[in-house]
Amino acid sequence: MIKATFLFQKTKIKENLLTFLLILTTAIVTIYIGYRHDTLKQSLTYLFLMWFFSFIIDLYALLSPTKDTFLVRQPKRESFYFIACFTLGLVFLFFRFSPSIDWQQLNGIVRIALLPLILFMFPIGLAIIMVLLKYKPNDLGFRLNGLILIIPIILISALVNRIVSPQSLTYDVLVAETGGILGALFSGIIAAGLSEEFFKVVGQTRLGAYMKNFGLGWFITVFIWAFMHAPKWYSEDLNMTEAILGSIRIIPIGLMWSYLTHRTKSILPSVIVHGTNFWGLQNF
């Protein structure tokens, strides 16, 4: 089955060379970021681990195939809704984190007018639209498939991070910031994992269906997700280069989480793996 998994991945690369080239370019830039920050070993380990997890995910999917699918009724219309939602979310992020705008000194009426856009920064607005379109949780990937995969991914991530880059571990910081283990889990799984993975599953399935190319829809969605972090990072040190490189740096882990969703046809494994990502191997 190991050989079959390698052949499966090779076939998928041949079928979608454009997506492969985009991933390869991202990997090259990620290695450059590691070199630039004197963390080349960490960046190489990070990239290898993301591929290794994709291999484990494919192996599991070949051994335990599922007939479940993601329902997409109107690809063009729903892709438009997805793009509109993230655009409105970006508008809020701009006003909230732009160094040229003092949020606290902003006119009260303007702030009140902008506050509803929070619904689109977090995908609450997107979720409401999916409900109005009569999608059920099962249609959007809320299934129990593939939960066994969270065990090797979390354990291997923790072990490798401890060995290769113990200084990048974020567990203690997250626990301190959120007031304890329960707070860290709630913040990670609900605020980050659920909201961001829901955003990505809607995007990659709709864009993929509209373009008739899952791989491209997958990459574009993760690219959007990654760069939605840029406004906040830029506001912290006003370094546009590092904000851009930082966004590119998290694309590989974002791709892995979204691939986990795609192959298991369930959002729950990626929500848990994302939400318990206290290791920080991608931080360099």
Segments predicted by a language model, with ranges:
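N-terminal, membrane-interfacial amphipathic/helix-forming hydrophobic leader that caps
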Residues: 1-133, 283
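Transmembrane helix-loop-helix hairpins at the membrane interface
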Residues: 2-9, 24-34, 153-284
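Residue-level signature of transmembrane alpha-helical entry/exit and packing/kink sites
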Residues: 15, 19, 43-47, 78-82, ...
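Alpha-helical transmembrane segments with an aromatic anchor "belt"
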Residues: 71-77, 143, 209-211
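Alpha-helical transmembrane segments of multi-pass integral membrane proteins
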Residues: 82-96, 117-126, 148-165, 185-192
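Short, well-ordered beta-to-alpha junction loops that form the rim of enzyme active sites
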Residues: 91, 144, 273-276
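Transmembrane alpha-helical segments in integral membrane proteins
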Residues: 127-134, 199, 203-205
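Hydrophobic, small-residue-rich membrane helices and short re-entrant helix-turn-helix hairpins
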Residues: 132-148
